[in-house]
Design a protein with these regions (language model features):
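Short aromatic-glycine-(Arg/Gly/Cys) micro-motifs in beta-strand/loop hairpins
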Residues: 3-30, 66
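Short, mixed-charge low-complexity intrinsically disordered segments
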Residues: 31-35, 39-66
Length: 66
């Protein structure tokens, strides 16, 4: 299990990225999504806040779709 966060600020392409604790690209403005076994679960949780969600290329690559 790892703690995941979603960036409160959208990327220039419109999506809000999900990051795992320890990511070098962790945003300062973020919402804690709690503990998740997979990035897929964290992305589902982030969709409660934002409709356009993507995983970080660096720490949640399995969920990065752009």
């Amino acid at each position: 299990m790892a703690v995941y966060y979603v960036n409160n600020n959208a990327q220039p392409t419109g999506e809000h990225e999900v990051h795992m604790t320890g990511c070098s690209y962790m945003p300062t403005s973020k919402t804690n999504l709690g503990d998740h076994a997979t990035c897929q679960s964290a992305v589902r949780a982030a969709k409660q806040y934002y409709t356009n969600v993507d995983g970080c290329y660096y720490c949640a690559r399995a969920c990065h779709t752009r």
